[in-house]
Amino acid sequence: IKRDVENAKAAPSGASAGAATQPDGLILPQVLDDRVYAPDSYELVPLDGMRKTVAKRLTTSFMQVPHFPLNIDLELDHLLASRAAINAAAREGVKVSVNDMLIKAAAMALMDEPDCNASYTDKGIAYHKHANVSVAVAIEGGLITPVVFSAETKGLAEISEEMKDLATRARERKLKPQEYSGGTFSISNLGMFGIKSFASIINPPE
């Protein structure tokens, strides 16, 4: 205890040793405590710019934005039957996914419920005129959310083709900044891993 007190006295005021205080008030560790983890007991992999940005933005969001997850069970028999019929009649090369249908459904719902398609600001509530749906895409070393802009105006085939293009270029790290910013609502899917439900973190300023 005496050693801890002496170390605390020697540490800079306002932050503990081995930690950095960010402009937004977050205290992030710069190094692991050698008294807990020996330096040769782990391998340190530096973060790239994207991971640093994602970590900071989502940590801030989780701390500052009220989160209240809601869950409901849905019967998707009709949706799956409709998807099969749509794909059977679609032109060659078009294959609509469940995700594509969820993008369209979310966009239509957002236009019907403007309060869900809004962003809070200090000057007031910004009600967005279009449903710009972000879709989480896993890429090497992180996650990115390309946007289907004005999704309420697009058909399923157009959404499907656009989403395939965005996801491909996202994995190749060829997206332009304007293609993964400006969303008003996000969709993240973990169903392929057997996940039935999860509480996601709001992607600000959505």
Give the label of every model feature segment.
Residues 1-206:
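C-terminal catalytic/motor cores of large multi-domain enzyme assemblies
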